[in-house]
Design a protein with these regions (language model features):
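Single conserved hydrophobic/aromatic residue that forms the stacking wall/gate
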Residues: 1-15
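Right-handed parallel beta-helix
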Residues: 6-10, 14-22, 28-99, 103-114, 126-142, ...
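Glycine-rich beta-solenoid repeat tracts in large extracellular/virion proteins
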Residues: 6-10, 72-78, 95-101, 119-126, ...
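Beta-rich carbohydrate-recognition and catalytic domains
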Residues: 16, 27-28
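Short, surface-exposed polybasic-and-hydrophobic patches located at secondary-structure transitions
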Residues: 36-38, 282-286, 308-316
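Low-complexity, glycine- and small/polar-enriched segments
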Residues: 47, 51, 262-264, 302, ...
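Carbohydrate-interacting regions of secretory-pathway proteins
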Residues: 63-66, 114, 134, 195, ...
Length: 324
């Protein structure tokens, strides 16, 4: 489902999907495409190269051959006053809900379950002024993700993702409760998640990720009042997350991401490999990370590691036992 304005400089207004039904795509084709054969990797390389060398968007025609570039299930492009309310989703080819360059909206009472490759729950990309509440996510990837475009295209669009609140949501399964990045080239600010739960197992509760190709900024991101079961990391910042791109394509231009103002407060977790791991970039260290009132039952590997971060404030961070 793709909703967008016909004119690039105009927005669709008051677009909505509501009701008690279920959106369930037929997955026969898409499940085959979850694999990454060589033609798919070559298509990714071609698309990345075109974007990095300023090939006009209209000339980036990729739906050919065996490229296997999967679509989002729900994609809103340049829409205003969006409402998503009350329905269920079962499975998705790629990101489940993608809100791209949208302004204003409410996402509530959704029951989302999708366990395929790249099945994020909801991705905000260069969007602003949204509330997400009372949703359940059961994902094959991250639950709630904040993005701001990749590299040259996002630098050109210069549209930060900002002013987003997520509350009273739960993630039943998935990689991350709140993910920031790694596509953050347009900048991210003013994100607040509170009163959410991850009762089972996740890789990370709060994950800030970027790399030396992204540029942009991340500032004023908050997590508060979260309860969790098991996690590899309660909080992680990693400034060199490249995944398959590391070897697939070269660095066309280096721009380090500015990260300033990451806050975690009142978080409990039954078991974690580590409480926090902060890996900044020596060329532009992360600044101002506050971690307070965090309680972990069992720590399995290490309590904390910090590199290239200025002004880490830790207060009342405790654990019951360390098991190695």
């Amino acid at each position: 489902l793709h909703v967008r304005s016909r004119r690039q400089r105009q927005m669709c207004i008051r677009d909505r999907i509501t009701g008690k039904g279920t959106l369930q795509p037929k997955m026969d084709t898409w499940k085959v495409w979850f694999k990454r054969p060589q033609p798919h990797l070559e298509a990714l390389k071609e698309l990345y190269t075109k974007a990095s060398t300023d090939v006009p968007v209209i000339e980036r025609q990729m739906a050919v051959g065996e490229n296997h570039l999967r679509p989002h299930l729900i994609h809103f492009n340049r829409c205003k006053n969006v409402l998503l309310d009350g329905f269920k989703i079962r499975e998705s080819p790629f990101w489940t809900i993608h809100l791209y360059m949208c302004d204003g909206g409410l996402v509530r009472n959704l029951d989302v379950k999708a366990h395929g490759h790249n099945n994020d729950g909801i991705d905000f990309e260069m969007s602003r002024n949204f509330l997400v509440e009372d949703c359940s996510f059961d994902q094959g990837d991250d639950a709630v993700v904040i993005k701001a475009g990749r590299n040259q295209d996002a630098w050109r669009l210069n549209t930060p993702c900002k002013n987003i609140v997520i509350r009273n949501c739960q993630i039943l399964k998935g990689h991350t409760l709140l993910g920031i990045g790694s596509e953050i080239s347009g900048g991210i600010r003013n994100i607040y998640m509170h009163d959410c739960t991850a009762p089972n197992s996740v890789m990370r509760l709060f994950f800030v990720k970027t790399n030396h190709r992204r540029g942009g900024f991340i500032e004023n991101v908050y997590m508060k009042n979260v309860q969790a079961g098991m996690a590899q990391r309660v909080l992680e910042i990693d400034t060199e997350v490249l995944y398959q791109w590391k070897d697939l394509v070269p660095t066309y231009e280096e721009r380090i991401t500015r990260i300033d103002g990451i806050y975690m407060d009142k978080v409990t977790c039954e078991s974690a490999d580590a409480i926090y791991e902060l890996k900044g970039d020596a060329k532009l260290p992360v600044k101002n990370v506050t971690i307070k009132n965090v309680k972990v039952g069992e720590v399995k590997k290490f309590v904390k590691k910090v590199n290239n971060v200025e002004n880490v404030v830790e207060k009342n961070v405790t654990y019951e036992r360390e098991v190695k």
